[in-house]
Curated annotation (Swiss-Prot):
Compositionally biased residues, Polar residues: 669-678
N6-acetyllysine found at: 135
Start and end residues of each stretch annotated as Disordered: 1-30, 173-201, 220-242, 282-437, 493-683
Name this polypeptide is given: RNA-binding protein 25
Residues found modified as Phosphoserine: 225, 228, 578, 672, 678, 698
Domain RRM stretches: 87-164
Maturation and modification: Sumoylated.
Subunit annotation: Interacts with LUC7L3 and SRRM1. Specifically associates with functional splicing complexes, including Sm proteins and U1, U2, U4, U5 and U6 snRNAs. Associates with exon junction complex (EJC) proteins, including APEX1, DDX39B, NCBP1, RBM8A and RNPS1. Interaction with NCBP1 is RNA-dependent.
Biological processes, Gene Ontology terms: apoptotic process; mRNA processing; regulation of alternative mRNA splicing, via spliceosome; regulation of apoptotic process; RNA splicing
Organism: Mus musculus
Compositionally biased intervals (Low complexity): 616-625
UniProt function note: RNA-binding protein that acts as a regulator of alternative pre-mRNA splicing. Involved in apoptotic cell death through the regulation of the apoptotic factor BCL2L1 isoform expression. Modulates the ratio of proapoptotic BCL2L1 isoform S to antiapoptotic BCL2L1 isoform L mRNA expression. When overexpressed, stimulates proapoptotic BCL2L1 isoform S 5'-splice site (5'-ss) selection, whereas its depletion caused the accumulation of antiapoptotic BCL2L1 isoform L. Promotes BCL2L1 isoform S 5'-ss usage through the 5'-CGGGCA-3' RNA sequence.
Domain writeup: The PWI domain binds nucleic acids with significant help from its N-terminal flanking basic region. It has an equal preference for binding to single- or double-stranded species, and it contributes to RBM25 role in modulation of alternative splicing, maybe by mediating RNA-dependent association with LUC7L3.
Amino acid sequence: MSFPPHLNRPPMGIPALPPGIPPPQFPGFPPPVPPGTPMIPVPMSIMAPAPTVLVPTVSMVGKHLGARKDHPGLKLKENDENCGPTTTVFVGNISEKASDMLIRQLLAKCGLVLSWKRVQGASGKLQAFGFCEYKEPESTLRALRLLHDLQIGEKKLLVKVDAKTKAQLDEWKAKKKANGNARPETVTNDDEEALDEETKRRDQMIKGAIEVLIREYSSELNAPSQESDSHPRKKKKEKKEDIFRRFPVAPLIPYPLITKEDINAIEMEEDKRDLISREISKFRDTHKKLEEEKGKKEKERQEIEKERRERERERERERERREREREREREREREKEKERERERERDRDRDRTKERDRDRERDRDRDRERSSDRNKDRSRSREKSRDREREREREREREREREREREREREREREREREREKDKKRDREEDEEDAYERRKLERKLREKEAAYQERLKNWEIRERKKTREYEKEAEREEERRREMAKEAKRLKEFLEDYDDDRDDPKYYRGSALQKRLRDREKEMEADERDRKREKEELEEIRQRLLAEGHPDPDAELQRMEQEAERRRQPQIKQEPESEEEEEEKQEKEEKREEPVEEEEEPEQKPCLKPTLRPISSAPSVSSASGNATPNTPGDESPCGIIIPHENSPDQQQPEEHRPKIGLSLKLGASNSPGQPNSVKRKKLPVDSVFNKFEDEDSDDVPRKRKLVPLDYGEDDKNATKGTVNTEEKRKHIKSLIEKIPTAKPELFAYPLDWSIVDSILMERRIRPWINKKIIEYIGEEEATLVDFVCSKVMAHSSPQSILDDVAMVLDEEAEVFIVKMWRLLIYETEAKKIGLVK
């Protein structure tokens, strides 16, 4: 077992004692004992931050085990008994200057270490404590004796065990003691003392090795900062460690520690005893959790290692398979080579057989010839020598053939060597290719992750934008509701105070005749006012002429009136003008009248120059044109003097056509015969002026009202009929829209005339609307989705099926979108049926 990290820190609230001052004593605890005495930890709540207050253990003396050399069978049994349970030792107060390798070697001097665990902090720095697991309890006892309070650098090492480990050590020592009691009574105290001497001798030997190890690390321990161990120094330490390992290890007598019963036997307060028990239980639980977490991490590491080994084995099997294939290929090559060798050997055998046959034949020939002449002996001897020479030549040829064969064999061996090199190179290339593929896959994964993060970011931006839009829409809707409530309140008050007799003439119109009669009355009143004003002006002119000393003011006024009438009369043409001259003249008049129209304000409605009519002739009721307003005064006077207004285009007359006296009055006869021609001549320039600015101002200002011609007749009737038709059409459209249901069930159940839904209607009305709504909902154009919705509509699909398909893309906006689209479809089909649209 191991101690949790929180037991390695000083308790909060208790100040540290100065060096050299012993810690305070608590009731029920004896004073501190010399170093080397086995100790147990005191709980944190009663422990000072100075050297830890420890309780001395109760010595338990067991009987000696006898001479081991006289009982070899007993020696094996003793070795089995020494291998007790694994025990964990808490090592604390480790100096920062002491390297982890030094602590490992110190722990290894005391016995076989199964594991050494030292916690790393958040910064990666090793903590000042750790947990060492020994294979045998004997090693644990030796570590407690030799390493506790060992001076390392500026600190003393702290070595402890917990209560559970103490219980295991007590059990192990009890077994050892029982084995000692079961031995014969012939065992003497001298043997036990010799065994104690052996243990002390071994402890002294290990202690000397520890001192040598500390002297070896003295440069690091005395250095101002911790330095990492160099590679040569590690080799030197390992050599010295091997030297000390070669010494024989003597068995260690069990040294019992204090048990839980001993703690209960100590005189102390009840709450402190309970606190100690709780601290021990908490320590066990914490260590158990740490062990479970470490076990999980170890399992994960083993799984990863297992997968890595599986991949290595798979790669190794692949290499072995390729090697076996190459080996089989080489084996086939060797078999072929052996077959060729056997074939050559058979050829040689055949050659030798033929040679022997020839030799025998020659021998027979020689035998036959031997009985012939001696003269032939020489020839035979020469033949024989030639045969021997040929035989030697054949032998040399065979030797050369064998040499060539050996050369070919060496060449094949070199070829096999090159093949092996190629295989190794191919393996390296495959490994590099695997590494490249792995890096490529990792890069793709990173790119996918980056793309996902980018899409996520865009989606979040769009969602935030939509949220803001929804909030603004909610605010606008709330504002509209407030306005409607305010308007309803105003209308309620208005209707409560409404009086039909008093307010109907103000808010309702009668027939056209009544309207024109009222306009005529107003016009007559305006004419009367104009006559009065003209008389006043004439009187003013006469007074001015008298003030200037004119002899005959009346004659002067008459002369001015005649001059104005003469200017109004058309000139007599000597010869007809050509069409080009007429066009030039018309363009000049247009240019002359354009500044007049440009000076008018945009809000003023265009009107034609009023026609000069004699006051004596009473106009008909229908003479009030649509352009005439009740506020427009008449321009005639009894004497024929016309007073121009600010809307009159005759204000732009040249200076020479005005009276010399400087008055802004225009004189003229009331019954001028050339007046209709002048009106006809000026109709076209005025229309052209308005047509010129109509296109430019159509986007910025409202369209100007169409001018009504002065010649009232069929045109007036048609205009009135057109106005009525427009009003009726607007009423039809409004009633049609009101008839279309707004609730989804009634809207989807509305019968739709699919025969009217054609490609022309789809392209002109439905598709642009769908595209605009998709851009509004998604934020970008989505041609595929638009085509899909249009195809579903052209396929006469039900609105619910289209809603189900579109809901996967538009989510909660899908229902609103389909409801609006279906209302548009119903409106277009119904409007086309009744002729509202073409």
